[in-house]
């Protein structure tokens, strides 16, 4: 129904639109059967699917490189790309893609260039670096607020970092921040 709504609203307004479907925020990798069923049903329903972000094998923590077996990942990427070719073609999307340098070439190869990498985290970190350099007190406020929210907010992400991994702002000089 959401796909129908998006289509109706955009077409009636004369707007072009596209859908990127994300199913990557799960504990288990997306199976090929799940990928097929999800994409097939969306496409049969008239959804303008441009890319799909499955949950791939391995670990995709925010801000660090891929953790896992690269050969197994490459084989899995090829399999998911084959599903996308049969049903679409549409792009495979890598969410939590920031800093996954070891797998970018594998993704490009497996998809023959039909891929999307979501790197919003890197842009956010670069923005924080600018704040730290130009307004250290504002950066300290952001860090203190973030530390206060970390235990709650990390529940929605796959991360292994702990608060003990980072110094308190009161213990760090501006250059360290």
Name each model feature, range by range.
Residues 18-25:
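Short glycine-rich or small-residue beta-strand-to-loop segments that form or flank ligand, phosphate
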Residues 1-14, 27-177:
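Active-site capping/gating regions of soluble enzymes
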């Amino acid at each position: 129904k959401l796909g129908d709504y998006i289509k109706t609203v955009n077409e009636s307004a004369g707007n072009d639109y596209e859908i990127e479907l994300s199913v990557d925020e799960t504990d288990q990798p997306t199976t090929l059967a799940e990928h097929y069923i999800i994409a097939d049903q969306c496409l049969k329903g008239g959804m303008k699917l441009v890319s799909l972000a499955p949950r791939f094998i391995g670990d995709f923590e925010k801000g660090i490189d891929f953790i896992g077996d690269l050969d197994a990942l490459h084989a899995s990427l090829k399999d998911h790309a084959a599903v996308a070719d049969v049903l679409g073609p549409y792009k495979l999307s890598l969410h939590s893609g920031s800093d996954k340098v070891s797998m970018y070439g594998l993704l490009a190869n497996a998809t023959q260039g039909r891929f999307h990498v979501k790197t919003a985290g890197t842009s956010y970190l670069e923005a924080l670096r600018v704040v730290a350099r130009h307004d250290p007190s504002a950066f300290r406020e952001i860090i203190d607020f973030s530390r206060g929210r970390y235990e709650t907010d990390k529940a929605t992400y796959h991360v292994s970092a702990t608060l003990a991994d980072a110094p308190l702002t009161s213990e760090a000089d501006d250059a360290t921040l």
